[in-house]
């Protein structure tokens, strides 16, 4: 059996009026702006709603409507891989014509959905971060538990690496690099990376210590692309440590070209 890891996000929340009374059967419409993907939900008897299986990233726009209340619109929401975004909204009655309606959404710092130490690295961060080797091992250093490919003092060979839910592991311990035996995919193809350490989430299974969960980019309604040139040579390596001369550096040059196109 193959157990896929988490490849989606979720959103949940509560809708109430200014008196704190639950609003039942309010329509919640969530739109993924880059692709136009739409998700719908209806609040239950407690005024709560939830949507599972959503695309990671964003931006998302949330519109909440109910008879007798002004529409509530919340924009520029970004979802993290494997996390539930909590959005609590207070709606304003629309008895008379209003010049302006201000809707305030809150998100608790203490989420019951947290299931362990997690670090999410978004596509915006992946684009901005410098990387010497253009590999996952450079990126996961953003996790405070990371030491190379090992986490919380564990051996890097026990780290679980999944891409779009599929395991890419070095099960026989024959590789000295990633659990999958090297960089399995171009960094430009990755949409988001999640680093988890000893999670107690039943969806994250079949490993001990640390897990790296990555998802690739998917199509949108906008045609776009990226391009890069990665160059490394002996002039970028030092030949002296303190006062010790390590000798002349040998020729060691490597140039990698790459590009992506999608829409």
Where are these regions (language model features)?
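Periplasmic N-terminal accessory/gating domains of Gram-negative outer-membrane beta-barrel systems
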Residues: 44, 50, 70, 75-90, ...
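Short helix-loop capping/hinge motifs at secondary-structure junctions, enriched
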Residues: 221-222
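Membrane-embedded beta-strand positions of outer-membrane beta-barrel proteins
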Residues: 225-229, 261
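Periplasm-facing N-terminal accessory domains of Gram-negative outer-membrane beta-barrel systems
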Residues: 2-111
């Amino acid at each position: 059996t193959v157990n896929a890891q988490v490849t989606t996000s979720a959103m949940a929340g509560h809708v109430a009026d200014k008196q704190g009374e639950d609003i039942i059967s309010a329509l919640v419409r969530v739109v993924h702006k880059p692709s136009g993907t739409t998700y719908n939900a209806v609040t239950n008897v407690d005024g709560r709603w939830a949507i599972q299986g959503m695309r990671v990233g964003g931006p998302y726009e949330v519109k909440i409507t109910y008879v007798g209340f002004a529409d509530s619109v919340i924009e520029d929401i970004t979802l993290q891989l494997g996390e539930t975004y909590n959005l609590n909204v207070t709606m304003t009655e629309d008895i008379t014509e209003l010049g302006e309606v201000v809707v305030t959404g809150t998100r608790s710092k203490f989420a019951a959905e947290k299931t362990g130490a997690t670090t999410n690295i978004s596509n915006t961060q992946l684009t901005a971060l410098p990387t010497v080797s253009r590999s996952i091992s450079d990126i996961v250093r953003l996790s405070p538990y990371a030491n190379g490919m090992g986490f919380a003092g564990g051996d890097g060979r026990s780290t679980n690496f999944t891409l779009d839910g599929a395991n890419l592991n070095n099960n026989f311990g024959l590789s000295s690099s990633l659990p999958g035996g090297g960089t399995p995919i171009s960094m430009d193809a990755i949409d988001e990376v999640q680093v988890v350490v000893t999670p107690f989430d039943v969806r994250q299974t079949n490993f001990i210590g640390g897990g790296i969960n990555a998802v690739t980019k998917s199509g949108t309604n906008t045609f776009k692309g990226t391009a890069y040139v990665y160059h490394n040579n002996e002039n970028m390596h030092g030949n002296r440590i303190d006062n010790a001369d390590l000798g002349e550096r040998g020729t060691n040059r490597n140039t990698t070209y790459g590009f992506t196109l999608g829409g």
